[in-house]
A protein has these predicted regions:
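Transmembrane alpha-helical segments of integral membrane proteins
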Residues: 55-56, 153-167
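Short alpha-helical transmembrane interface motifs in multi-pass membrane proteins
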Residues: 7-12, 81-84, 108-109, 148-149
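Hydrophobic alpha-helical transmembrane segments in multi-pass integral membrane proteins
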Residues: 54-58, 116-126, 185-195
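Juxtamembrane transmembrane-helix termini in multi-pass membrane transport proteins
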Residues: 2-70, 126-145
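Selective transmembrane alpha-helices of multi-pass membrane proteins
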Residues: 66-95, 156, 160, 170-195
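Flexible cytoplasmic inter-helical loops of multi-pass small-molecule transporters
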Residues: 92-106
Length: 195
């Protein structure tokens, strides 16, 4: 990979990993509501699911020419529906202001999110088909970069969770407002899938 291409790869992956998306918003919300330590299940579920999705993207990237557009479209709708459901759950979840302690989302719920998270699917397919496959079609490289993509995504999730933890007091004071803003950001993510 040339230095220019490598620079473009890092720019793309870091910007994509650090910008708002379902995982980062969920990580922020979980750490704000329950603290970083209590959010490790959420982060672990995201990380494992992310890795599996990146490996699946590696397989998909090998056969982009034969992907059925209807299947991709169906996946987009499923992802948007799940993201809107997640937004509703966040917007209506109890906060410390309400005097209630909401239960943190489970490992399996955050794991399942990855399989309908269109942002990370597009992230994986785009990175692999743009930066890796034109350079090499060696399976070891494609799998290795898929693992790297999952690690970069996990880094972004942890950064957002740490922000939620560090600003926990402020976010808890304005918990209802934060939940509504996060829910609206998720709805925006769902809409952006189609536009």
């Amino acid at each position: 990979m040339t230095p220019t291409l490598l620079s473009a790869f890092w720019t793309y992956t870091l910007i994509t990993a650090m910008t708002p998306g379902p995982n980062n918003i969920l990580a922020l919300n979980s750490a704000t509501s329950h603290g970083f330590r209590q959010s490790t299940r959420v982060l672990a579920g995201m990380s494992l699911g992310f890795l599996i999705v990146m490996l699946l993207c590696a397989g998909i990237s090998f056969s982009l020419a034969v992907i059925d557009p209807a299947a991709v479209h169906l996946l987009s709708w499923a992802g948007a529906a799940y993201i809107v459901w997640l937004a509703w759950k966040i917007a209506t979840s109890p906060t410390k202001e309400d005097g209630l302690q909401a239960k943190p989302i489970s490992f399996w719920a955050s794991f399942a999110l990855q399989f309908v998270n269109v942002k990370i699917i597009l992230y994986g397919v785009t990175a692999l088909s743009t930066f890796v496959l034109p350079q090499t079609q060696a399976l070891s490289w494609v799998v290795g970069v898929s693992v790297l993509l999952a690690m970069i995504g996990t880094f972004g999730n942890v950064c957002w969770a740490l922000a939620g933890h560090l600003f926990q007091r402020l976010f808890r004071q304005y918990g209802r407002q934060l939940n509504i803003v996060l829910a609206l950001l998720l709805v925006y993510c769902a809409v952006r899938i189609f536009y």
